[in-house]
Amino acid sequence: MYAVIKTGGKQYRVEEGDVVRIEKIEVATGESVDFDQVLLVANGDDVKVGQPMLDGAKVTAEVLEQGRHKKIKIVKFRRRKHSRKQQGHRQWYTAVKITGIQG
């Protein structure tokens, strides 16, 4: 059984037991969180697709950690002008473990 959820402006395909890094949400480590924006639920050949969301479906997860991704470098370079700009960015994430899918 798997589901497609929407959180943080992105969509994730999740199964029970998966550990997923999503955009940061303000929930303490060890607490449970419910995702009610479920786009699709599939159980074998039984597939339910929402338009755009499924009513009554939800995915529950446990927060494992809050952290930051690896640093990415942003470089702006102007040729022949002896000008360049370099910047780094580390995006915050929340790691969650999917504990249940209902729907």
Swiss-Prot record:
Belongs to the bacterial ribosomal protein bL21 family. GO terms for cellular component: cytoplasm; ribonucleoprotein complex; ribosome. PROSITE patterns: RIBOSOMAL_L21 (PS01169). GO terms for biological process: translation. This protein binds to 23S rRNA in the presence of protein L20. Pfam families: Ribosomal_L21p. Keywords: Ribonucleoprotein, Ribosomal protein, RNA-binding, rRNA-binding. SUPFAM superfamilies: L21p-like. This is Large ribosomal subunit protein bL21. The lineage of its organism: Bacteria, Pseudomonadati, Pseudomonadota, Gammaproteobacteria, Oceanospirillales. PANTHER family: 50S RIBOSOMAL PROTEIN L21, LARGE RIBOSOMAL SUBUNIT PROTEIN BL21M. InterPro entries: bL21-like, bL21-like_sf, Ribosomal_bL21, Ribosomal_bL21_CS. One of its GO terms (molecular function) is structural constituent of ribosome. Part of the 50S ribosomal subunit. Contacts protein L20. It comes from Alcanivorax borkumensis (strain ATCC 700651 / DSM 11573 / NCIMB 13689 / SK2). It comes from the Bacteria.
